[in-house]
Amino acid sequence: AKPNSNYILFTLVIFFISNYCYEVASIFYNSLLKKCSNENDIGKTSGLGFALGYIGSVPIMLLTLYLFVLPETVPFGLDKSKFENIRFVPLVVALWFLVFSLPMIYYFKKKISYEDNFDSSPSFKKIIEIIWKNKFTSTGKFLLARMIYSDALIVLIAGGGVYASGVFGYTPGELLKLAIVANVVAFLGVLIGGYLNDKLSSKKIILFCILVLTATVFYGSMIAQTKTEFFYNVMVISFFIGSIQSASRVMMTKLLETKDLGKGFGLFSFSGRITAFAGPLLVGTVTYLYSQRLGL
């Protein structure tokens, strides 16, 4: 792909394929949580998984920032005027993703037995029964709620950079630095959240995070006027956003029987994506008609 309008469709197709593969992989990845933890430490295990994901992204972002974004002359003879330095970054990320997936692939292949993990004869009826048995099951109610609040999380994660750039004038380099600090804060937040998940409950963690995130987003969109205010606002959001993701996975794991983990996490992924367009569409519409602040 090249940085002109002729490659928009091609880029979207590639993005669709990569995102689809990621979502499918996450179904099986999430369904292994019960196998990797004990009943009394499932929150810490889930939190540690998310925490390592957040902190593990920091080195690659630093590498990207200081090798490809900030220098006037970048490696491999890449031409910054043609955005080749930016276009090269996904290749580095793809390699990073592959290399650090290998230990998990090798370990689970050798150490984990799958024979009691999944129903060998799934059917549409069995899938429906997970969420509906004459009325919504507890799992169905949770997935319905998650479908709503996950839309808000998608807007925060996907649209935060656009908002920071449009309202507070963040440059690409500043956005990357902000993301690095935010990921470190998220690492700490989700570790604490995972520990508290085992002490309290997933439901309490989720509700508290929703309350804090709602108040914080309101402050950042309607009150914050300076970059400093916005920076601390992002830090608070980062601290809690990982905890709600981790607690959601734990709650789903506890709601499902072992044989339903594959089907259940398929629905879990589906519920997070089926209305994924709604949040960005609403924000985009309000932003277009009024302002970015009201949109957020």
What are these regions (language model features)?
Residues G189-S202, T287:
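Helix-to-loop junctions at the C-terminal end of transmembrane segments
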Residues A158-L175:
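Short amphipathic helix-loop junctions that connect adjacent transmembrane helices
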Residues V24-S37, S243-E257:
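Intracellular juxtamembrane helix-capping segments at the cytosolic ends
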Residues E39-G49, P172-G173, T258-F268:
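Loop-to-transmembrane helix entry/capping segments in MFS-fold secondary transporters
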Residues K2-I14, S221-N233:
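Helix-loop junctions at membrane interfaces in 12-TM secondary transporters
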Residues Y66-L95, T285-L296:
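A membrane-interface helix-boundary motif in multi-pass transporters
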Residues K109-L144:
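Juxtamembrane intracellular "pre-TM" segments in multi-pass secondary transporters
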Residues A1, K204-Y219:
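Structural signature of the two symmetry-related core transmembrane helices
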